[in-house]
Each structure stands twice: as structure tokens, then as C-alpha cells.
Amino acid sequence: MASSSDVWLSSAIAWGLAVLLVSGCGTVPVVPDRPTSGALHSVDSPLARSVQASAPNPAMTGFLLMPNGFSSLDARVELASRAVHSLDVQYYLIANDRTGRLFMRSLRDAALRGVRVRLLVDDLYTIGGDDMFRDLAAFENVEVRLFNPFCCGRQSVATKFIASITAFEHLNHRMHNKLLIADGVVAVMGGRNIADEYFARSPTSNFVDMDVLVVGGVMQRLRDIFDAYWNSREAHPVEAIVIATGDRHDLRRAFDHAVDDGEQMRSIPVPATDMLGHRPLGRELDEGLQLVWGTAVAFADRPEKVNATTVEAARAMSAQMNIMDRVSASARSVVISSPYFVPGPSGVQAFRDLTGRDVKVAVLTNSLAATDVPLVHTGYARYRTELLRSGVDLYELSPTRMFRTDELLVPAMSLGRLHSKAAVIDESIVYLGSVNLDQRSDSTNTELGLLAESPELARQVIDVIAMAQRGSSYRVRFARDGVSLEWFATSDIGDVILTQEPEATPLMHLQNLLFGPFVPEQLL
């Protein structure tokens, strides 16, 4: 999900305008000529040589965990600047803000050097960026496609759905994947979209998130996944959706004017080493990649999941099952970070089965005050008591305690929100990716994930999650009466015990009270 007010609430408020706005609109135009293309796998580029020099075995996969937002943004821009053959880029959201414009400039600059750029963006949050995407496509070596696009009503998210109301069931399915592949040999994947709040650059609220850079054995599968989405019938050339009014030279000038705001990557305070001791990627590439090695499998929903007409059909191809199957097979411990955590009855039963086998289960999710989509919290809260009675340890992130934890680098006085999607199973198997443990990831959106077997990577992920649990979260537990809940945390002045949802405003409570019971879990 993106950082935004709730889509469904906005749509509901605007529902009365539907009749006025729908007429004459409904379906995306058919694109008869949609050329297919495949990933380019470089063996002689500088990036390829750096990977080859660091790899102990070409069948193994190397990992560089990136919990720091500044470092993660730097890695993307660094890869774009060093690519010589290809950049394959797939995101749910690229915002038209400082970070989005910096990222888009890096793609343009690569194309000007002769790098083939394929950019695939979901069409839900392209509001304010239509021209930017269309104009980038006017450059040589660049193709831009929109996934599952809306035909019209492009002024806002609400008007997109209203203007396409007859196709709501289809358009409600979104591409939530996040992936960047450079020269076919290095990839960055994980939870981050491209916007200020994902890289600790927003003055108001920022996400605690996690990405991973990967090389080696898993790359062939990642290339195949990208190609499957790029060549799917749901990926439409941007110029077929956002109609241009000028020639290619005009569009290029407009793009340059829109994105060249003077900010350079060097102005971003990338730490000399992050909380895990990792150097900026440029130094890693120049001085030798210091990676954790193991085995890995990448997985994704098939693009046609968005065409599923029933929940059962969508679940039959759900990438989420790759995670839950491994979680359910755990023998000792499961540690989960899921910002949007709506387990449903089957998920609760799966966790109950685990704790019944003496498997220790701990889940970190957002508190009501921390979540960017308060209605999702109702889907979690309705299962909270059952989970606690089953023996699951629950931790809820505080939005205001985050800036006290220097290692997580949430800027002082901004709100902290959890966005990392990760799990560690038996201290050796790691999941990282875009998949939330909620109903939308299960049966609505397409997702991308990675399952890695590496005790060292597992230790790093556990350490990062523990930082948030220890200094920035409330532990949810039963009060002395064994029925009501309380939220426990430690502070500089002693223990804190609260008996109501911590830091939540009356408006949050009212919104959930009024709308929560009526929103189907498939929409959360």
C-alpha cells in the first residue's frame, strides 16, 4: 500500500458523483501493437565484473540487506549511473516529489548514455505524474508502460475509480511489486516504493522499511518475472493512455524542466556505514562487494491474477502462499514484520498450530496511530485477542518513539510508520519482498518476494526488527483481568502501561467505528 488517505473511504464519499462522471468512460483502449522484449544479461559490464569477482559460486545468491533509507536510495541511483546495457524497473508507486524526480532523472541519464530502460508502473498512484511518465518515454532507449491502467478520470484516485466504476472489480487489482534490475546482474527488491517517505526524506512521516540487493543464482528468475509482467496484456504503453500534445522534442524539454530541480545524490546524507556496517554501494562496487551468500528462490504472482473473477481463483495463484507454507513448516521460531497484518481465520489457525507445537511466534505491525491506512487496523484488531490467546507475541510500532532510535534513522519530529515486509523462520530462512500478510496481498494485488536460506542474513533481519521492537514499539498483552488489553513499553523514566490504543486520535477511533465493520477484508 502507498502512503495516502484510505482509497476506499475517498471513493465512498465521492460515490454520489458517479452517475455524473461515468458516462462515456469505462474501458482502456485496445493496443494492437505491443512489441515484446526480453531481459538483457550482461557478462562484460563493470557491474557484471564486480559480481563475478565477489561470487564464490555462480549458483549461489549474494545478499546486501538495506534497512537504511538514505543508503537504499543511493543504491538505486548508483546502479542506474553504472548500468551500461539495461535497466528494468517495476514499481507500484513513483511519486512526483524530490525522490521521484531524482530517480526519474537517473533513468533519463542512463538512457542518454545508451542504456535500454524499461519502466513499468502500476497506474493507481500516477496522479500528478502522468506527464512525467509520458515525457520520459519520448527519450531514445526508453519504454514506459502502465500496468492495469484506468481509462479516464485521471485527476485523482477517487475519480479514476468513479469514472471506471463498471470495471471496479478488475481495476481494484493492483501491481504491488517493487524491483530494479541493472544490466541483468544486480537487483534491488523489497518493500520500498519511490517517494520521499520511503527514504527518510519526508518532514512529516517516514516509513521504517527494508530492501535487499541481490546478485547471482536468483537473477535468472527475477529477469523472467520482470519479462512476464512487461509482456503481459495488462502492461500498456503510456503514450496510449496519456495522450501527448507536442512532438518528442517538446516532451523531452518538458521532462527536463519538470525533473531538473538541481538536487544531486551527493546532497543526501548517506552514512559512511549503516547500522549493519555496510558501506555505500559505490564503495562496495569499487572496493569489492561484501555480501552474505546463500541460496534463494524468487517468486511472484502471475500477472493474470488481476483478471481473476473470484477470490478462490486469485488465491490459487497467490504468492503469499510461498511464505505461509514455509512459516507453517517452522520447527522453532517465526519472527514477522508486516505493516498491514490481517491474518483472517486461516492465518490465526496457522499461528495457533505453530504455538501448539511450541514454536515461538512474534509479529511486529503498526499501531492504530502509526498506520497510514487506519481502516486496515480494524482487520488486524478483530483477530488480536485470538492471536494473544494462541500465544503469539504482538508488537505494535509507535509513531512518535521512532526518532528516539537513531539506528533506524527516522528524522526527528517526523512520525514513524512500519512498512517492511519480512519474516525469519527458524533463524535461517528469510522472506523479503512486497507481500503483506493481509487479504489484499493474498487475493487482490500482485506481489514479488524472495525466500533465502542464510543464517547470517537471518541474523541481520532479526537484529533490524529487534531494534524496532525494543525501542520503538508497544508490546500488546492481557491486563490482570485476563480479558482487556494493555500496551507495555519501556522509557527513560520507567515502564509505560496504557489501557487504550496508544497515541491514537479520537478521529481515528471514530473512523474505524463507523466504517470498519462494513469494509470487506478483501479490500483491506
Model-derived segments and their meaning:
Residues 2-13:
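Bacterial N-terminal signal peptides that target proteins for export
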Residues 12-23:
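Bacterial N-terminal signal peptides
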Residues 25-178, 182-524:
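Charged, low-complexity intrinsically disordered terminal segments
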